């Protein structure tokens, strides 16, 4: 016990000694030290700001459940009309309803976006146009949507095409001042709807569940949700992506019935599959469903289906903006350029002290001691660069909206992990940059130095 304590005390004493030498060296070479600190701080800060944006854009939007959520795809376009053999990212009405009615998953959800004219139940507010989603009732439970008041509607409401609606907290504040509005009515497109739930502030980023049907997955959240069956019954047109192949019926789709019976893809679908066995079973069901469509003559090509998890789906849809990925690459390149310059500056710093190294070696200092001394000095400089990097990172986060899209910039946050990573990057980069200069310093021959300075 005492031997270990003495060894620890001796190590701490040596570390203090090395830091003292580093401090003296920095005071002797103030300009070089300041330049190295500036380079490390700028390089680390640039990387961290870009990383914060990339992390926000590429983050798992529902990490506690993403392994259970999947997107089914069915190729109803055929090899002559699909994209490089891949099925459409959305489903036709025929396939979407078949999926919903089959109930082969724990939960299944259909989604399509639309615009609604909202008129509150009083004369104090003017009508407004709001973005909404038509969804099946499992939507709120599947995606763990938080409610401030009330809840979602029931399966029977779906079956009865009930005139019910769930509104966002923002719309509730606008119409009812944030009060509990459950049970009250609003008009949507001149039809009365009863409010059954008010969502809490909820905006998954990216909005992964309808990323295939929206133009931009980082846009503002939907303001209202109505039953899918109700929207279909009212012939509510989709305001989001609508894909038709050249083999679809009349491409202009003159009426609602034509839309429902066409091979156009416009409905997003999700299924919840808790276990791996459920995933395999559902994948088999998808294949068998497509094979049945081929057998009855609807498809004249072999089954072509996909079942993708959240992470894979976001990659397929290329959700991470190219600007954020490119910015990260450029920032890392800038850090590498800084490192190259730091290597040269540290080499100049260390080799100017060759006489000092020669004297220390002549007095019995080992090469290991020289390594420890100069790497400690590099770590101290890196730590100073990290502190500067923290300030520059905070400053960069303030002006981040001027470089990146505002919708993505608002997602980037300066948290404790980013602060720690900034310092860690600066210290690590400084140590890496010091390896070659330290090796050169340790090769100094004491006899030659003493003779040349004699």
Identify the residue ranges that each predicted region occupies:
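Mid-to-C-terminal secondary-structure elements
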Residues: 138-152, 163-317
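Structured, solvent-exposed hinge/loop segments at the ends of secondary-structure elements
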Residues: 2-4, 8, 51-175, 179, ...
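C-terminal membrane-exit region of the final transmembrane helix in multipass inner-membrane proteins
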Residues: 421-454
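A hydrophobic alpha-helix feature that marks transmembrane segments and, especially
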Residues: 51, 330-357, 370, 437
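Short, strongly hydrophobic transmembrane alpha-helices
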Residues: 28-62
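Membrane-helix entry/capping segments
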Residues: 1-19, 24, 28, 32, ...
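Transmembrane alpha-helical interface segments in multi-pass membrane proteins
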Residues: 34, 340, 356-401, 421, ...
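Short helix-to-coil transition segments within interhelical loops
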Residues: 26, 350-353, 359-368, 444, ...
